[in-house]
Amino acid sequence: MGSLEVPCIDLSENDTSIVVKELLDACKNWGFVSLKNHGIPLDEIDRTFKLADKFFDIPVEEKQKYLFKGGRLHSGYTGHFGEKLDMEHQSRGDLKESYDLAGFPDPKLENLCPFIAEHMDEFLQFQRHCYKLTLRLLDFFAIGFGIPPDFFSKSHSSEEDVLRLLKYSIPEGVERREDDEDAGAHSDYGSITLLFQRDAAGLEIRPPNFVKDMDWIKVNVQPDVVLVNIADMLQFWTSGKLRSTVHRVRIDPGVKTRQTIAYFVTPDPETPLSPLFEEKTGKDIETVTAGEWIDGRINFTYGYSAPPKGYLGSQNDGIVA
């Protein structure tokens, strides 16, 4: 197991050109970057984690009344084994439970958990901070590529974004199998992901420029930073210049739980996905809209459908430059 520090960028730097260069370098070589002075109040992050604690304390039987049932409006509860991220190597789903909230900026959901509804204003406040940071990062990417600053951000209205509460644990009475994963090896579907971590480590990554020498690299937990990773759509969109890195979660032995919050960023559904630059992007992939892509990936991951048109595989081997 390798150990390297993910690059960390200070967003309070006044010279935008420095931030843009460091951000692009990290996302080209690692696909992951840590951000400090990111603008999201630390007390709001802590408050959202406390709300997540209370949600996961709700009895499983009650949470299961609000199960996620497929589709792009990705909202609802998913219990242990409900999501299998590495179809090739896992015999059953991940050792985690989650609750997803989508449909921003004004979620209107038929199957909304009462606890989530009760605290909707707090979740939406946190989501707005995440979205503001997202737009800033997308503009930095565009500036770095010398294209109009709003090239990416204008296609991200937040209506497809997902705020996910996550708790990794082994259910009572369940024995861990040899091929079990807390979260199987995968790359994310959309444009970028913001990850907030607390307490226990467990995230492992395979940066593109290091995998020849190292297998998996452990990522340390830094509560005051936001961890950002590039996802598949943005890798494809930038012709592989930004890299969507394969990652997984494996909690250390003896650690009972790990909690995180993820904010998944996805282009608006009508956005056409085609490579911006001329470099080869791997095997030919039929152009699809962002909506078609995300529908297919979600439904395949949850076992509702066959692999989607243009599916790249769990090891992300189809769109690497």
Swiss-Prot record:
Keyword hit for Ligase: no
Keywords assigned: Cytoplasm, Nucleus
Xref: SUPFAM superfamilies: Clavaminate synthase-like (SSF51197)
Main location: cytoplasm
GO CC field: cytosol; nucleus
All residue ranges annotated as the Fe2OG dioxygenase domain in the record: 159-267
Pfam families for the chain: 2OG-FeII_Oxy, DIOX_N
Descriptive protein name: UPF0676 protein C1494.01
Organism per entry: Schizosaccharomyces pombe (strain 972 / ATCC 24843)
